């Protein structure tokens, strides 16, 4: 009898974990789909980064609304929206920023030189477009995507996938899963008819690697401050670098 009860408990725990896994997936997937639909209603045909800015702002509202739903019994601070361990965060971010700027600058310049300096950006570099692009990449994107992935998704998974693995550093299974979902989110597709519209292996790999780093930072500090700053710095610096290279090599 005791063995049967234990087996039943194990099965129930397993089924609950499967349910939570798919719930976390549905959160980011449906938030993205709903934000796409609502943004298209207002900004179809607009400048791409204007569209993305509204899309990501809608994502923030929807993710926070889910966090605040009755019955969740968690404050926004528990979801990571706090300034805990900010001194630790800033020390890590400083090291990350230096390494990221040096590494990505060298990599981008070398790959651009080897490939004959092709255009990095597919829009006209007017002052308005540059400002919208930089605001999105250096402010909005990190806040939105980290609230969704290291906030809502990770926070949903963490009570059930809290066991950690050590691979040179310590990270929970919740952190790994959130990084996988983050990488999947960088694959473009349409539902009807289903087709893959964008698949860049290098971009997906980098998204996964950065997702792991953001998750480790989230777990180390208990806050989304670090992941948001790191995300905005990583995307923001590349945006500045791309603009400078494009202006020098192509003039617009």
Task: Label every PLM stretch briefly.
Residues 40-52, 75-144, 159, 248-252:
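Juxtamembrane helix-loop-helix connectors linking adjacent transmembrane helices
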Residues 65-81, 144, 148-149, 153-154, ...:
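Cytoplasmic juxtamembrane interface segments
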């Amino acid at each position: 009898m005791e063995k049967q009860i234990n087996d039943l408990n194990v099965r129930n725990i397993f089924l609950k974990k499967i349910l939570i896994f798919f719930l976390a997936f549905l959160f980011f997937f449906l938030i993205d789909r709903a934000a796409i639909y609502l943004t298209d209603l207002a900004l179809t045909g607009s400048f791409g980064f204007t569209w993305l800015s509204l899309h990501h702002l809608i994502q923030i509202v929807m993710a926070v609304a889910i966090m605040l739903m009755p019955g969740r019994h968690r404050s926004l601070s528990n979801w990571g929206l706090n300034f805990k361990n900010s001194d630790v965060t800033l020390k890590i971010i400083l090291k990350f920023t230096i390494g990221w700027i040096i590494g990505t600058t060298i990599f981008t310049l070398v790959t651009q030189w080897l490939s004959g300096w092709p255009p990095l950006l597919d829009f006209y570099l007017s002052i308005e477009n540059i400002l919208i692009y930089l605001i999105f990449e250096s402010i909005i994107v990190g806040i939105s995507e980290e609230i969704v992935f290291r906030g809502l998704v990770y926070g949903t998974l963490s009570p059930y996938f809290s066991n950690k693995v050590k691979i040179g550093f310590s990270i929970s299974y919740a952190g790994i899963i959130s990084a996988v979902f983050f990488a999947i989110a960088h694959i473009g597709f349409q539902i009807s008819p289903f087709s893959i519209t964008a698949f860049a292996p290098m971009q997906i790999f980098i998204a996964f690697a950065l997702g792991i780093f953001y998750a480790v930072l989230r777990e180390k500090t208990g806050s989304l401050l670090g992941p948001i700053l790191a995300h905005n710095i990583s995307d923001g610096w590349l945006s500045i670098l791309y603009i400078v290279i494009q202006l020098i090599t192509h003039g617009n």
